[in-house]
Design a protein with these regions (language model features):
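Boundary at the C-terminal end of the N-terminal hydrophobic targeting segment
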Residues: 16-18
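Sec-dependent N-terminal signal peptides
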Residues: 4-14
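Active-site-adjacent substrate/metal-binding segments within catalytic domains
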Residues: 20-120
């Protein structure tokens, strides 16, 4: 469980780094590198990586951008049957439920989502 938590935390940190955000000690405001405050207006799409295909993901991200959301919150492993039920492309996240053996196809979709989100 600790490995999952650490992996999820690392994923969140990488997402923040991709945004070029600045966090200052003792300051509750997150800043954009180019200046100004960053408003964390998040939508929860917990099973985004697990349920949607690429076309649906692009549609979802476009819709969230139109509505002004700045953050999409999702989980890497679905809470309900996330290790046993494949994603939209038939990939399970782990080989034999072993957290040291990831399935590349499953995580390639996450790379796609991050790239697409970065375009918006």
């Amino acid at each position: 469980m600790q490995k999952y938590l650490l992996f999820c935390l690392a994923f969140c940190v990488l997402g923040c780094l991709a945004q070029d955000l600045i966090v200052r000690p003792n300051d509750p405001i997150i800043y954009k590198k180019e200046g100004g405050a960053f408003l964390w207006l998040g939508d929860t799409a917990w099973e985004l990586f697990h349920v949607l295909d690429k076309e649906e993901i692009v549609h979802y991200l476009d819709n969230r951008q139109e509505k002004g959301f700045t953050v999409i919150q999702a989980v890497i492993l679905s809470e309900l049957d996330g290790l046993d039920k494949p994603n939209a492309y038939g990939y399970l996240p782990l080989v034999d439920k072993d957290p040291t053996q990831i399935t590349e196809g499953y995580f390639e979709l996450m790379d796609f989502v991050i790239r697409e989100a970065g375009k918006r």
